[in-house]
Structure formats: structure tokens, C-alpha cells
């Protein structure tokens, strides 16, 4: 009977916990409770975010992958919070100090910081001045002072605590020890810390100064800097952190100390007793300055950093998504050009399928001679003629602009139309030195591999960029300064979402691409490639079940994202999930034709009057039916086709050719908190400051522009000495 009652109590606690988390997520994400419950259930059942987002829309009310990832992240945090509460309650209860009021406060805490505040007085402590004073038997004296009711002077009261045995040499030491106990007690009071933290955030500021006067650095704007904590922008937080880390800046929090001390004294000193008030005033000041303020400063700075990192990771993720979703340039022979100075520019010719046809090195950049420049041009011209090169993909790293000038001059001497593109080469060197690149190009050196990668990035950016750690792609700000685990998880999520949005060709996709598909691990991705090599091409999606370690659950998660061109079933070339094939067959039958006719020379349109009724007849959800019809309208459509295509160039401008007021077309290369860098075809990217991005007020550049966008910009300033170009998108129609 007792066991049954205990089981009921545990069950009741778990249900309450579950409902608390559901309620919190509903409020935070501003969605319906049933949507959150469905999403949590699907996640707990082992379904991936891309699968839930694409194939379980009825269950979640069409929550997209971004909302689902936020939900998953917050779900993990809230569950971690509940685990922490459980651990804290258990620890305090074991000490016999758990009151109903304290229990209620802990259970109602909304953050880990508040739980830690409440637990602080009960947490096992290292040896402090207060614990040493307690060991010397001075706690009763501390309690006496705190009561503020003694008629005697504290010096008189303290005499009885002087003890050679306990190493309390005199009255002064006794009072000092008692004061240490009280200072720690005040610092441990959760309500005090919460109020002081809130006051500091509300009225405090972040202040920075230079460690050395008149030192030139990129942090000069922070040499005499102060901004309210509540208004400090994320990119400034990260810049201050970096300046401090590089030992150029001193950064601290300026708190409203007078206001805090005045309030804190009112809480601690309840009566004006001349015997105790002076001591308690000193206790409060010591407690705040020695114990509370440094801890609160650390917490606030950690919180500012965490929020700034989260914001930066979000920007990095959006930039990465745009880079990955750039449209492929298909059916073109591409020359990849990895620019460099001393070691020469590495070139690689890649055919329409991505196969490397030839590689070489030319030396047209400094230190060079006219003869070397001429030889480089002749080499490239011969390659263009021999391999019928259509495009040159130039990496945007060191010596890019010098290479660009050579290419432009050379193209004027070529009879056929060849254009070039400046390609983001971030991470190419990381890839070229990787184990994967060594396996792919065992006979190439790192430069040749890098050139091949730069060429392939133009042909299929997604397929090439997945081979690189997303953190190395570098379309963000301060990415090397932040929590690498959190950054890695977020960016891997972005890559996963992009790969699954596009889908992969099951018969050509590399293991690097396959491992990002929903439900597919690195091991299974390698097994798919091994199966393909041993048995030839896949002709049916269900053949995946023959792959080692790929069971029914993994098949359910991955099948809809795998495409088979020219297979047994034309639906295998679409994003229609195999679980819906029967419904599609019924749909075609109702329309009066077969799938073979539809995908062959038969009718090309499907007519539906009542989606709701038809969905019921087919045994699927109405949203799923809409998705199926959309897919059948453009089978196997690549969503990247809707993205802006890269600007192909055959000439280059010089900075000195720019004039204020010129309108130019450019490509957004990077988006950061304070603006966007745009490639306008000169030797330097221009900056569109956030204030120049839109005619209306915007909080962040991403509201208007993304990496890869082709935009019209107006030149508003040119600084040849500092090589800076100011651009504007305002007032351009």
C-alpha cells in the first residue's frame, strides 16, 4: 500500500513537472499548448527536427524548424533546471533545513541563477573567513549583534569569546570574526542578491579604459567608454571581452553603489542601537564590496556574454544558411583559383560533374615580374582553350584582388566569353588539410585541393561546404571567442536543416552530405556509400533498409529526404515520403490516371475542389495533401533555385574610380550586428551601416539583407588611405 502511495506521489510530481514545462514553453514561444505537447512528444520519441518540421505538420500545427530548434533548446534547459531543483531540494532536506517556504521558492524559480541564489546558504562551503570564525565559536556573538537588542557595548559582550585555545587573541579579533560570519550571511541571502542584481542591471553601466595610454589598436573607441548595461549591444560586449582578453582594455561594472548600500543597510539594520549599528554598517559595506559586488559583476558579465553570444550565433547561423543555400551553377566547367603571393596561385579545372581535370601553379602576384605575369596569363588561356572553361571561381582570401586584376586583363585577350566570380573561400584551407580531403585527393597537395574546393563551391555550394566544420566557414563575428560547443551545435543544426530542405541524390551524395540527413549518423552514411560501391546504384528507397545499421526508425526519418533519379518509382525522385505513396496512388486513381502516366507524357495538372474532404478520403492530413500537391507540381524542385544567383563579372573597378552618388550592384558578403559588407566589384568590400540599410527603422540588418543577396547600393564615401568604402541602400528604387 505504501509503495503504491509513493508511486502515486512520484507520478503526480512528474505530471506537474511536465505541465509546468509545457506551460513555460507555450508562453515563451507564443504558440498553442497542444502544439508544444505534440512537439515534445515527437522529440521524446526520437524524431529529428527536420522530420518533424517536414512530415509531422498536422501534429505540430506546422511549426517550422527554427521554432522547433528553439523549443528543443529551451526544453533541455527547463529539464536541466528541474533536475537542479530536485538535487537542491534533496541536499537541503538531508541537512534538515528545508522549510515549506523555501521549498515553494525553489519550485517556483524560473532560472538556474535564482535556484543557485536560494541554495547558496546551504551549499557545502570551502573554508572561508566566516567558517573559520564559526570554528572559533564566534557564531553566538554574531547572532547577538544581528539581534540588535543588547544594552552592553559589543566590546564587553566579546570579552567572553577571547580564548587562547580557540586562537581568538583579543576583543577586536572576536568582533572581526563575528562580522565575517554576518557578512557571509548577508551575502548568502537570496532576496538581497536578486534585488542587488536587478538594481545593478537597471541602473549600472559597463565601463572600459585602456591599460596603456596612447596605444594604437582597433579598440580605441573603448579607451574611455561607458554605456548602461540595459542598452549595451551584443557586438560591443564581445568586442570589450576580446579587448580585455588581449590585455588592451580594463573592463568593469559600475553599480549604483550608494543606492544599493542604502537599501541593504535598511534591510539589515532594523533598530538604531548605538552598540550594534556601527558594526552592522561596516558588515553591510564589507559584505557588498568583498562578497556580493564581485560575484554580481561576474554573473552580469557572464549573462551579457551569453546573450551576446546567442545573438551572434543567430547571425552566424543566418549567414551560414544563406551561404549554404546559394544556387548551384550547373553544367559549367570551372577553373578554381586559390590566390597567394610568395607560394603562387594554385589552379584546378573541374568539369561539369565536379571531377578534377587538371591542376597547376602560376606566379602573377608579388613578388613577381612581367615575364611571370605573362606566363601566368598564357597558362590560363591554354587551359581555357583546352578544357572549354566557362567560369573562373576566385577565392576571396590573400592576393584575391591582385589575382582579379590579372584575370580581368587576361580575359580581354580571350576570344570566348569567360566570366569570373569572387567566391567565399573561408574554410578551404581547413578542408584541404583534412583527412577527408586527403582521402578524396590523395595525389594532390593542399593548394591543389583548396583550388578544387573553390571551384566546386560555385558548382554546388552545399555539397562542398558540408565537408568543412561550420565554425571554420567564418561568416559571423567573434566566432572564435564564444562557447565553441554551443556554436558548433547551433551551426550543425543549420547545416542539417539546409541539407534536408534541399534533399540529396542517394546515388551521388558523399558521406559528408549524407551524415546531415535526418536519422543518418556518420557510421550509417559511410555504410550507405559502401553499399552503393558494392551493389551499384539504388533503384528504390526501400533498398535503404538493406544498409547495415539502417533500421525502420532511421528509414522513417531519412527516406523523404533521399532522392533517386530514374529509379523504379518516380515518387522516389520527390520529397513525398514513402508513408504517403499509397495516398498518392489513390489520388492519381481519383484523377483518372496512373503515376506512370503523370510522370510520363500524361496530364500535368491535378484538380481539387475540396481539400479537406479529399484528405479524409485519402487517409492523410489536409496540410500533408497541400504539400504533396505542391511537390507534384514541381517534382524534386530545388529550393535554392529561388535564391539570388551570384554576380558574374568580366571587368573590375578600381577604388579611385568610385565617386559619391554612384549606384552599383553588389553581393552581400557578410552580415553583422552593425551593418553588412557588400562586394561591389572593386578591391575592397564596402560597408552599409545599419543606419543606411533601410528607409525605415530596423533593429538588425538581417531584417532586410542576408549573405548572398544581390543589392543595389549608392556610394556615400570613399577613403583611399584607409581603404574604406561607405555605401547606402536608402532612397534607391
Model-derived segments and spans:
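Duplex nucleic acid-engaging cores and interfaces of nucleic-acid transaction enzymes
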Residues: 67-70, 77, 81-91, 95-336, ...
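Single-stranded RNA-binding regions, centering on S1/OB-family and related RNA-binding modules
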Residues: 12, 567-568, 572-733
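A glycine-rich phosphate-binding loop feature that marks nucleotide/adenosyl-phosphate handling sites
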Residues: 198-205, 337-341, 397-399, 423-430, ...
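Short, Lys/Arg-enriched N-terminal segments with co-localized hydrophobic residues
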Residues: 3-18
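Structured, non-catalytic alpha/beta "coupling" segments that mediate domain-domain communication
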Residues: 91, 105, 116-118, 243-256, ...
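Short, ordered loop/turn segments at secondary-structure junctions
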Residues: 55-57, 146, 256, 339, ...
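Long, highly charged, low-complexity intrinsically disordered interaction regions
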Residues: 21, 73, 80-97, 107, ...
Amino acid at each position: 500500500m505504501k509503495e503504491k502511495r509513493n508511486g502515486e506521489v512520484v507520478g503526480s510530481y512528474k505530471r506537474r513537472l511536465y505541465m509546468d514545462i509545457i506551460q513555460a514553453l507555450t508562453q515563451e514561444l507564443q504558440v498553442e499548448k497542444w502544439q508544444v505537447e505534440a512537439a515534445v512528444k515527437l522529440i521524446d520519441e526520437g524524431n529529428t527536427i527536420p522530420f518533424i518540421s517536414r512530415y509531422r505538420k498536422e501534429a505540430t500545427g506546422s511549426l517550422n524548424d527554427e521554432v522547433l530548434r528553439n523549443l528543443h533548446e529551451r526544453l533541455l534547459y527547463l529539464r536541466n533546471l528541474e533536475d537542479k531543483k530536485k538535487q537542491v531540494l534533496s541536499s537541503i532536506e538531508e541537512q534538515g533545513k528545508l522549510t515549506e517556504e523555501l521549498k515553494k521558492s525553489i519550485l517556483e524559480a524560473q532560472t538556474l541563477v535564482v535556484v543557485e541564489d536560494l541554495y547558496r546558504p546551504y551549499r557545502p562551503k570551502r573554508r572561508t573567513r566566516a567558517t573559520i570564525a564559526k570554528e572559533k565559536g564566534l557564531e553566538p556573538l554574531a547572532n547577538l549583534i544581528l539581534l540588535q537588542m543588547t544594552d552592553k557595548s559589543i566590546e564587553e559582550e566579546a570579552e567572553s569569546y577571547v580564548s587562547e585555545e580557540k586562537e581568538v587573541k583579543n576583543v577586536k579579533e572576536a568582533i572581526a570574526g563575528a562580522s565575517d560570519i554576518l557578512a557571509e550571511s548577508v551575502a548568502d541571502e537570496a532576496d538581497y542578491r536578486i534585488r542587488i542584481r536587478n538594481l545593478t542591471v537597471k541602473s549600472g553601466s559597463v565601463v572600459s579604459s585602456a591599460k596603456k595610454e596612447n596605444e594604437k589598436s582597433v579598440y580605441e573607441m573603448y579607451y574611455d567608454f561607458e554605456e548602461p548595461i540595459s542598452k549595451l549591444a551584443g557586438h560591443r560586449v564581445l568586442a570589450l571581452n576580446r579587448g580585455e582578453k588581449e590585455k588592451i582594455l580594463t573592463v568593469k561594472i559600475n553599480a549604483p553603489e550608494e543606492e544599493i548600500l542604502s537599501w541593504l543597510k535598511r534591510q539589515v539594520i532594523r533598530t538604531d542601537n548605538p552598540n550594534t549599528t556601527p558594526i552592522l554598517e561596516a558588515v553591510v559595506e564589507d559584505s557588498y564590496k568583498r562578497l556580493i559586488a564581485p560575484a554580481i559583476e561576474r554573473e552580469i558579465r557572464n549573462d551579457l556574454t551569453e546573450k551576446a553570444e546567442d545573438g551572434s550565433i543567430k547571425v552566424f547561423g543566418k549567414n551560414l544558411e544563406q551561404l549554404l543555400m546559394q544556387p548551384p551553377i550547373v553544367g559549367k566547367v570551372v577553373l578554381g583559383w586559390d590566390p597567394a603571393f610568395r607560394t603562387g596561385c594554385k589552379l584546378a579545372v573541374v568539369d561539369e560533374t565536379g571531377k578534377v581535370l587538371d591542376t597547376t601553379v602560376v606566379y602573377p602576384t608579388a613578388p613577381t615580374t612581367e615575364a611571370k605575369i605573362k606566363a601566368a596569363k598564357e597558362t590560363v588561356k591554354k587551359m581555357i582553350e583546352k578544357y572549354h572553361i566557362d567560369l573562373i571561381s576566385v577565392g576571396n582570401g590573400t592576393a584575391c584582388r591582385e589575382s582579379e586584376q590579372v584575370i580581368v586583363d587576361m580575359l580581354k585577350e580571350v576570344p570566348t566569353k569567360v566570366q569570373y566570380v569572387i567566391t567565399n573561400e573561408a574554410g578551404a584551407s581547413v578542408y584541404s588539410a583534412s583527412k577527408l580531403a586527403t582521402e578524396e585527393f590523395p595525389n594532390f597537395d593542399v593548394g591543389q585541393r583548396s583550388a578544387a574546393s573553390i571551384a566546386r563551391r560555385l558548382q554546388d555550394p552545399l555539397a562542398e561546404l558540408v565537408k568543412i566544420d561550420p565554425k571554420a566557414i567564418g561568416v559571423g563575428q567573434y566566432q572564435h571567442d564564444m562557447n565553441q560547443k554551443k556554436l558548433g551545435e547551433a551551426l550543425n543544426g543549420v547545416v542539417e536543416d539546409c541539407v534536408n530542405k534541399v534533399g540529396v541524390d542517394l546515388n551521388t551524395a558523399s558521406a559528408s552530405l549524407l551524415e546531415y540527413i535526418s536519422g543518418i549518423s556518420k557510421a550509417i552514411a559511410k555504410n550507405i556509400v559502401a553499399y552503393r560501391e558494392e551493389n551499384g546504384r539504388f533503384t528504390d528507397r526501400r533498398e535503404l533498409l538493406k544498409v547495415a545499421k539502417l533500421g525502420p526508425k532511421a528509414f522513417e526519418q531519412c527516406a523523404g529526404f533521399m532522392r533517386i533519379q530514374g529509379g523504379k518509382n518516380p515518387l522516389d525522385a520527390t520529397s513525398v515520403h514513402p508513408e504517403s505513396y499509397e495516398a498518392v496512388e489513390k489520388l492519381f486513381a481519383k484523377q483518372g490516371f496512373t503515376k506512370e502516366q503523370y510522370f510520363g507524357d500524361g496530364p500535368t495538372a491535378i484538380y481539387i475542389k475540396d481539400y479537406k474532404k479529399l484528405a479524409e478520403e485519402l487517409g492523410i492530413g489536409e496540410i500533408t495533401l497541400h504539400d504533396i500537391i505542391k511537390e507534384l507540381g514541381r517534382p524534386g524542385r530545388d529550393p535554392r533555385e529561388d535564391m539570388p544567383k551570384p554576380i558574374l563579372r568580366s571587368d573590375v573597378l578600381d577604388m579611385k574610380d568610385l565617386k559619391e552618388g554612384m549606384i552599383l550592384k553588389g553581393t552581400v558578403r557578410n552580415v553583422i550586428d552593425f551593418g553588412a559588407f557588400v562586394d561591389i566589384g572593386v578591391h575592397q568590400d564596402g560597408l552599409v551601416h545599419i543606419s543606411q540599410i533601410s528607409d525605415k527603422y530596423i533593429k538588425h540588418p538581417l531584417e532586410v539583407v542576408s549573405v548572398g543577396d544581390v543589392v543595389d547600393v549608392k556610394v556615400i564615401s570613399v577613403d583611399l588611405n584607409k581603404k574604406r568604402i561607405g555605401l547606402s541602400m536608402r532612397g534607391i528604387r
